[in-house]
């Protein structure tokens, strides 16, 4: 924050609108590419961050950046930097209904040699705005691209949903078409409390959750479903994850551990709360009651995940295996344009 420079002060001439800041450099981390700046963002310059060590290997496969508008509270670069500090084996960015931050994500990850997984969390309820509500309704579907073809298919599916809705901020996915759109190139995680499995469990107990899991398997294929166990340090995490793991075992599908991160580190918690309040157009005290897990929605090391999920080491191991199977470099999907001579001048 700028302070101590009143309009017309001796060290900075002012105007009737405040101090003249035209010569001041942009704040670090703003990218220099906001509408307020006339220059383009420069190349990412990696900090000298030592890779953390963890006795337990782990990769995060469900994380939101600030490109999940007013939901994620850390830029993609910050997520990568924190993943480096924690010693994560790979990182996925799964923003809501878009790939808006993946170039920044991929550039930062490349500097640290970190494998990248690309995905998105789809909002399946049609024509529902995410703003102006404490807890926007609707079911979510978390999709990871298994490879470049999966990325292309997911990108096309998201673009179609935006175009069909025809209004900014609204989407309309064709649920029947989703079943075929992946073509074996998507991996479906059952997601957070907004996912079909958790919603069914919360509303109808184990019988409803069993039915929801069967429907997911029938829709997307047995080999394309993984039951997500979220670790956010909540009092009921153990009980809920035990039930979910039992459902997965009964259906013969694997589990995977995630944090459902919405910011890089605990220091961003207050910012995340403030952004959620802005999204809901309410105050922090009100929104806090709707976000019980926000305090723990940050990246964690493998050692910490092992402490939070002591009964599910296989879910932690599976995160590493899935990341290894799904990771690819963004350059692999760059368009191969023909060479074109450009005259001088």
Predicted regions span which residues?
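Phosphodiester-processing cores and adjacent nucleic acid-binding clamps
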Residues: 1-345
């Amino acid at each position: 924050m700028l302070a101590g420079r009143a309009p017309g002060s001796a060290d900075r001439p002012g105007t009737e609108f405040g101090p003249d800041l035209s010569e001041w450099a942009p704040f670090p981390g703003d990218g220099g590419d906001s509408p307020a700046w006339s220059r383009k963002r420069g190349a990412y310059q990696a900090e000298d961050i030592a890779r953390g060590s963890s006795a337990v290997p782990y990769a995060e496969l469900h994380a939101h950046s600030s490109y999940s508008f007013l939901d994620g509270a850390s830029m993609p670069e910050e997520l990568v930097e924190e993943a480096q500090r924690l010693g994560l084996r790979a990182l996925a960015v799964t923003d809501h209904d878009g790939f808006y931050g993946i170039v920044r994500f991929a550039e930062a990850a490349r500097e640290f040699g970190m494998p990248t997984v690309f995905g998105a969390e789809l909002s399946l309820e049609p024509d529902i705005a995410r703003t102006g509500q404490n807890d926007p309704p609707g079911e979510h579907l978390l999709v990871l691209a298994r490879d470049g073809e999966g990325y292309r298919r997911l990108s096309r599916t998201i673009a179609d949903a935006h175009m069909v809705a025809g209004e900014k901020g609204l989407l309309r996915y064709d649920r029947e078409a989703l079943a075929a759109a992946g073509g074996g190139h998507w991996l479906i995680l059952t997601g957070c409390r907004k996912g079909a499995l958790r919603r069914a469990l919360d509303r109808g107990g184990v019988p409803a959750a069993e039915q929801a899991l069967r429907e997911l398997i029938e829709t997307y294929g047995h080999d394309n479903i993984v039951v997500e166990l979220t670790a956010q340090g909540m009092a009921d995490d153990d009980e809920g994850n035990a039930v979910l793991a039992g459902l997965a075992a009964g259906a013969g599908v694997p589990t995977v551990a995630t944090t459902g991160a919405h910011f890089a580190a605990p220091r961003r918690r207050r910012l995340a709360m403030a952004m959620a309040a802005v999204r809901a157009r309410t105050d922090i005290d009100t929104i806090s009651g709707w976000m019980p897990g926000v305090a723990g929605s940050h990246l964690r090391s493998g050692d910490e995940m092992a402490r939070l999920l002591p009964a599910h080491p296989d879910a932690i191991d599976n995160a590493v295996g899935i990341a290894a199977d799904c990771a690819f470099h963004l350059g692999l999907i760059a368009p191969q344009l023909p060479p074109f001579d450009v005259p001088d001048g």
